[in-house]
Amino acid sequence: MLGPRRKVPASTSLNNRSSSFTGHVRDLASDGRGVVTAPDGKVFLVAGAWLGEVVEVSPTGGKGQIGFGAVKTRLESASVRRQPPCRHHGFEDGQCGGCPWQFVDYPAQLSAKDQRVRAMCTQLDISAELIQPIVAAPGEGQYRNR
């Protein structure tokens, strides 16, 4: 028989949307959001966060074991970060959202895409010799179609 559930004070619970936390972006999700682990171990997907950055995250919701968050403060920025070239870029309601990585330089985008493809192929047991390099578009913004 299990004992009574231990209560966690609301002020320390990350389910409370007002509780922000600081974390290191350790990976990128398939949709382009940064993967940040909260101090309690819950994984958050954070739009606008890039590999290696340290960010203060404001939780915005979640589903099961995965939380969603927004960057409240960027404490350490990636060296590849830049001003997005498209005026429609952003993560707020009413902004396009079709090119989530425009805030980093194009070579960094290509490198991240290459790493994602290689990781997926490895999971599928596809030989690394069969994987071709990612091909850059002739013009950085000329291939997007959202």
Language model: regions and residue ranges:
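SAM-dependent transferase fold signal centered on methyltransferase-like domains
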Residues: M1-R146
